Every structure is written in structure tokens, then in C-alpha cells.
């Protein structure tokens, strides 16, 4: 399959796939891998919302609104943005009892907000990674709409991930690509980042690093054929996985390795 490389084509491709996934997307948390991710998301959302409880908060790439509704419980006003219209439909239903939440279907390379109006924003999942042709544009937009001393918390995929051992084609791509390489999930490409590359991005956009949380440090040693199964399908393994996940959650606070990193920064 030939993947799109023009940013507009990439956006349309990603939107179409997420539209098609909408009905089953909420079940993704039932998979072993994502169960660990969502635990970290909940902790990070609570920390960001508590640090900036007033003003406008954005959830970029909000999907079906799982993080949006958590923000809404603590933030003054929340706007969720997603490129998929069907995901936005689900998010509206989830948050219909929250009067301080609204949604916009749009592209995060062109945020429809004035300069310096946002107190805090999230971009979890492959929101930045899917925009692999426009990473600098996305960061520039996020910085533009953020208030001075506003918080930005976003997730990026790590280049060197243990699961590459199970995927020789992707391992070869990583070895032969300078900096982050492209990987694929559900027919969509996403960019990975080296630590140096990420650090340089923050410096380029004038952002001050506050915190880094690594996710799935140990769990990526589990073969993908098991890691991406639903927990109900492997109840015996789930007991073992719970122990690994607890250890992962602890290690992720100190180690800068794992499948992805959640980076929290402040605009000076």
C-alpha cells in the first residue's frame, strides 16, 4: 500500500481511517497495551488540570472524548478538536452532560484560536506523530495559541522500542534512518523521535521541559500477538500483566525509554 506524503492527503487518510474505527474505538482500552497507556493518561490529565484549573483547555486529537471529559471536571472551559467527524460525534455524546465542553472538527496544523488564549492543552496518542510531514507546524501552532506560562502536554513515539525485535522490517527502517523513522498502525503512518530530536524540537520552539513520563517500558517485550489482545481473551495472562503494568508505571517516572513518552512543557 502506498502511503500519502502530502499533508492534506495525510490528513484525509487519517480522518477516513478513524471515521471507520469509531464504532469500536472505545474498546481499544481493553487491549493490554492500551490499558497501560490510559492509566498514565488519567494521571497526567489530572496533574495538568490541577495545575491550570481556570481558563481554556484544549484536547487536541480528542477522539471519543475520554481525556476531554476528565479535563472538563477540573478545567474552566474545554474544547476538543479532532480530524474525524465520527469521533467528534462520539465525544459529544460522552460529554453531553458537561456544559463547559464543546468540540471542533478540524486540523491541528491550523488551530482556529487567537494567539495566547489557551491555559493548557493535551495531545495524547499519535496526534503529533500522524502529522509527520508537519511536526514543526503543529508545535508552532500549539505555542502560538498558548498563553505565557501555559502548559502543553503531548505524546510522542520513541524510536528505539523493544518491540522492534519482533518486527524485522521496522527494525531495519530504524537502523537505516537518521533520527526518528516512520512506523505504521492500522494503516496509518506515524513518526518516531529520538531523545535528541525531541530535545531539539523543544529548544527550537522555546519550550521549557517540566516532566517526561515513559510508557510501556517493560510491556513492549511481550510479543505483539499477545500484547494487542483484549484482556478478556487472556484472563490468566492478565494477572501477570497487572504486575508488569504496576512496575512499568513506576519505572516510567524515571526512565526515558519505552514505547512512547508524554512530555509536559511550559511556554515562557
What are these regions (language model features)?
Residues 2-52, 54-61, 66, 70, 151-177:
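Conserved class I S-adenosyl-L-methionine
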Residues 64-110:
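Class I SAM-dependent methyltransferase SAM/SAH-binding core
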Residues 109-121:
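A short acidic, Gly/Pro-enriched loop at the edge of an enzyme's catalytic core
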Residues 136-151:
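A short glycine-rich, Lys/Arg-flanked "PGG" loop and its adjoining helix->strand segment in the class I
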Residues 181-197:
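Acceptor-substrate binding/catalytic loop of class I
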Residues 211-268:
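A C-terminal cap/extension of S-adenosyl-L-methionine-dependent methyltransferases
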Amino acid at each position: 500500500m502506498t502511503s500519502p506524503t502530502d499533508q492534506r492527503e495525510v490528513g484525509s487518510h487519517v480522518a477516513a481511517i478513524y471515521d471507520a474505527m469509531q464504532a469500536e474505538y472505545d474498546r481499544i482500552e481493553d487491549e493490554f497495551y492500551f490499558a497501560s497507556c490510559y492509566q498514565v493518561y488519567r494521571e497526567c490529565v489530572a496533574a495538568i488540570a490541577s495545575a491550570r484549573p481556570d481558563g481554556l483547555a484544549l484536547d487536541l486529537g480528542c477522539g471519543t472524548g475520554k481525556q476531554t471529559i476528565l479535563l472538563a471536571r477540573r478545567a474552566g472551559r474545554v474544547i476538543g478538536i479532532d480530524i474525524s467527524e465520527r469521533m467528534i460525534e462520539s465525544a459529544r455524546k460522552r460529554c453531553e452532560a458537561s456544559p463547559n465542553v464543546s468540540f471542533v472538527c478540524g486540523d491541528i496544523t491550523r488551530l482556529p484560536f487567537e494567539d495566547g488564549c489557551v491555559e493548557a492543552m493535551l495531545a495524547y496518542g499519535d496526534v503529533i506523530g500522524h502529522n509527520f510531514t508537519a511536526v514543526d507546524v503543529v508545535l508552532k501552532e500549539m505555542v502560538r495559541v498558548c498563553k505565557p506560562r501555559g502548559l502543553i502536554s503531548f505524546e510522542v513515539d520513541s524510536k528505539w522500542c523493544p518491540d522492534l525485535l519482533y518486527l524485522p522490517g521496522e527494525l531495519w527502517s530504524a537502523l537505516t534512518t537518521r533520527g526518528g523513522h516512520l512506523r505504521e498502525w492500522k494503516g496509518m503512518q506515524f513518526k518516531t523521535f529520538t531523545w535528541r530530536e525531541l530535545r531539539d524540537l523543544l529548544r527550537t520552539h522555546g519550550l521549557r521541559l517540566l516532566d517526561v513520563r515513559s510508557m510501556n517500558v517493560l510491556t513492549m517485550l511481550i510479543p505483539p500477538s499477545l500484547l494487542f489482545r483484549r484482556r478478556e481473551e487472556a484472563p490468566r495472562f492478565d494477572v501477570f500483566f497487572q504486575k508488569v503494568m504496576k512496575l512499568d508505571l513506576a519505572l516510567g517516572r524515571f526512565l526515558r525509554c519505552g514505547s512512547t513518552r508524554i512530555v509536559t512543557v511550559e511556554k515562557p
